[in-house]
């Protein structure tokens, strides 16, 4: 429960209705308490941190002035919504964020009526809010719809598609878009739009130049009024993004200080009373109010539990490398040997492991902002000219560039390597960030080689294999650390389409893909079963699969992907095509979206940890325990 002595105002707020009982003069104090409570809570639980600190004042002002949940707020991405959750009935549960059965890390419609649209990926808010506004207006409903977009999300093309649609509509939609401009996504925001928005911080200079120009030019009788207007527009276009947004059909206001409560309240009151599409540009500081986060906005984007008095403290001792670390080291080593290699990321330099590469090879490093579609086609263009592009991307974000993968890369059989991080079970970030679909949507793409490593050394070998392969290739690896196998430093490759027999047992064979191999080996040793490290999802090792099928009574496929259309389906299709009849048990992720919980919890729930695999095998073949006669070979 909240400490009412430390947070006397926040303790009185369960819902925005309670917030609205305060006088405007008290909102500054409410915001200060909310910021302090967020620091305390995330310090205990971990979670997304710096973005929420940057929108404290904006969150308070919006819930104070708008009649939420009747008026609807749509938050982009969702990194910044912990303050929103605290003010909308989840204050006393916020310390459970990202935990199993706890508060969701992003807005989730099933969790609260105040979470009007589920998010996790960026740049969807304006489209969703516009759809809401159209639907409401068609019913004669005049409730207010507000989209809050920031943290670099305005750099994505989808946001501009929605802006152009909204601004050109007749009748005009009653929509407010708030651009939370903190010059950050997770890494620093990049691109031409970011530079243009940055000029807006000099708007005071613009105002001075504008007024000075009017006085000088206006005093000259031979200067027509239109010349004064052109002077204004010239400087306006240089310093303020209003020209662009107003050309799209939006009434632009700003920029204003997003931490100035009186200015926010005054401006929002005016905009609330006006009709049509409006855009409010607010300037905020990511990590505002917590000095370590203001100084390291990337490091404090998402954190584990920490002591707010000390900040983040590096853990002593050698750190076990993650798969992301393995990729990072490999990329730099490969770049040293291959001058045609380029590294591409859609705004995920830190998360995807390109920090070192960006420093050592800045001329070959491309952060394209939140533009997954562009990233993939950019790589395709490089490949047509003999380049060796590597696209480092999360599994969940690759979904956004699927057409480009198929149309621009695979159809043309171009030499592009996809390094797919956070594949399979991801964990605390929930359904929006899970990588549980990629094997299914990659396996069906002609020309594409798809690999999944069982350990760190194999990951490095597969990356080298994909780079050397004359065509598109994908290596997908999980979040977190591997099995502890040293990755090495060489650039050796693997024969494409060849797996390996890890354990020779009897009766039943476990055909495991990627990160499930270690658990399969544990079960194989316990029950005396054969274990195959399949390595390749496409092409499958046809000879090995057929040989194993001929030597065993039954097969089990294991993968950290949905069973439907996944790697196990490929094994079944191969056996069916060859006329081989064997009982097959397919183990993998269920036909549902992952909730937020630890990776270990989710693997156990899906039955693809060692205990789950063992239980499933014994349920299907109980004679492995009872000692009853073996199954007769089928077919």
UniProtKB/Swiss-Prot annotation:
Mg(2+) binds at residues 151, 182. PANTHER family: 1-D-DEOXYXYLULOSE 5-PHOSPHATE SYNTHASE-RELATED, 1-DEOXY-D-XYLULOSE-5-PHOSPHATE SYNTHASE, CHLOROPLASTIC. Pfam families: DXP_synthase_N, Transket_pyr, Transketolase_C. Its cofactor is Mg(2+); thiamine diphosphate. Belongs to the transketolase family. DXPS subfamily. It catalyses: D-glyceraldehyde 3-phosphate + pyruvate + H(+) = 1-deoxy-D-xylulose 5-phosphate + CO2. Its EC number is 2.2.1.7. The gene is dxs. It comes from the Bacteria. Pathway: Metabolic intermediate biosynthesis; 1-deoxy-D-xylulose 5-phosphate biosynthesis; 1-deoxy-D-xylulose 5-phosphate from D-glyceraldehyde 3-phosphate and pyruvate: step 1/1. This is 1-deoxy-D-xylulose-5-phosphate synthase. Homodimer. GO terms for biological process: 1-deoxy-D-xylulose 5-phosphate biosynthetic process; isopentenyl diphosphate biosynthetic process, methylerythritol 4-phosphate pathway; terpenoid biosynthetic process; thiamine biosynthetic process.
